[in-house]
């Protein structure tokens, strides 16, 4: 579930190292000796990522609109969401998560201290190791689905996701490679290409739905299988899309499986990755448990949660994820240069900006949950009916207050990763896991039918809030981070913006109801 300034300190513009392409987004190198990030560069990078991510998120919302039209909150849609969680888990763990969090700081440091050629050789070794490990895991996962089918009762709802899972598991390997390639491009300052990569998944997804579903009308099981194959093709497309840009940076995609662990930097990445994998694994276990418990409580619940999440992810991806994408390599370079003061300044400005942006978004979604859901998903002739709208709106109401929490957490976590401290987020995540599981189970047992998934969504928000507070306190103890001076004003401004947005949103909604009558309910 990112113009305002992000960093105000300006540094000197220097030439790229000899023999390397001059790139306005290139990272600092040993030859340049640059130690400070120019403020316009970080802001420009965030703007680029925000724009490209916005395009991808809008397409992601369009794809969910299409999914709602063809599948509604059916058990088949929920089963598809469950199957897609598995490759996404690997993506967040090995691609955008633990491996990237460990790889990008070491890759950035190698660029600074050893030069481009050495850094690219190191990257090839890491990608080769990833392909080898995930290739084996993917194969074993596919083989495991057949015994599971024989063990489950013939009428079990848990049989529905298995055929889709078999098809989509290799997507985990492809998307993890694509995520590492994106991390390299971000380190080179090529944010536009990496930010556009998810665009391909959404585009292929939408085209497949618009073509396959009408052709296979009345055959939803076949429709969903065709879509599963399309997602696998999208994973390959995301890898191929980034290769030309990396080739211009001197990278050659050639796997090498010999002596992978002989490189000290590879071993260092694995050492850094271990605690991060545990921490991110805990987070992903939370995500999986949310959907599994929701599916167990009500076959329609995972689909309702997904529709609500998609709306929340639109502003979260545009701003929160955009900031995190830019901040991780930025903090890594600043930490490698030993510039803690600039890290602090960058973080504080990012948090202030996110608070002012996200608070109004949370307020608007909170007060207009049902109208927003109805406007976006409830089209005549589709399978998304009033019950689907009600279930999804309840989930959105629970998720909306967490929008600010989710985005601020995305700003705090990269600081620890940039400092190559991956253990602290792990400890925090472990506390969150216990809390989230406890609240999830309590929600499923204690809440009435139709509200169980709301408790699950609320548990996610509360857990994220506690995790964010713990990260902030621990970061504060590390040094002069998160100074209180100046934040009181930012909090007041954020709350005023949220209140103004809530009043404006309700006023517009009431005006539309008065002008359009009952038709205003669809707004």
Regions found by a protein language model. Name each.
Residues 2-523:
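Membrane-embedded alpha-helical bundles of multi-pass transporters/translocases
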